[in-house]
Amino acid sequence: MYKRQAFCAWQTEYLLKGLGPAARYVQRYRLPTEAEWEYAARGKDQNEFPWDNADVASGNGCFYANFKPENGNYTKDGNLITSKVGIYSANSNGLFDMAGNVAEWTSTVYTEAGVEAMNDINPQLKYNAAKEDPYRLKRKSVRGGSWKDPETYIKSAWRTSEYQNQPRSYIGFRCVRSLANTTSQKSTKSKKR
């Protein structure tokens, strides 16, 4: 299990410990799918960037996210590399740092077809590659761009891939939970008295 998945599992267990019987209704933390990530990043108006305007080209975009606004200029926004989480405004969904700062892992297997390859039968393109699997099966979709990327890479629709077992200083992750009101996959144990 990779560290990002292990953290989601730890965060779930931490939450469940304090909830008692109500824990069975809590959805587990996980990485978002690629489609979920893009929907969340675009905001309520489905913007090209997570904010409400396209000031990136004028150089004002560096005040909306931590990215490289000009060729070789990493510090125009005042941050040499990663910035403190939440210092830029939230998007219309109330989410911070959906572009720039660090790109983000998704749980979706990377394919050239992208979200067009998803359908009702396979909405997530999930596959957890084992160590012995060929490298081509170990690519995961990465979204959002990072502090080292130019404007093109921080658009909400931009996507790339990295090998799931290769950590990168410019890629982080975001934990999400589904909102469904169903019983959690982990059942609570009742004690006999």
Annotate each predicted stretch with a short phrase.
Residues 165-167:
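Solvent-exposed, polar surface segments
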Residues 169-185:
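Short, structured beta-strand segments at or near domain termini in extracellular proteins/domains
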Residues 3-156, 184-193:
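Functional-site microenvironments in short loops/helix caps that host divalent-cation chemistry
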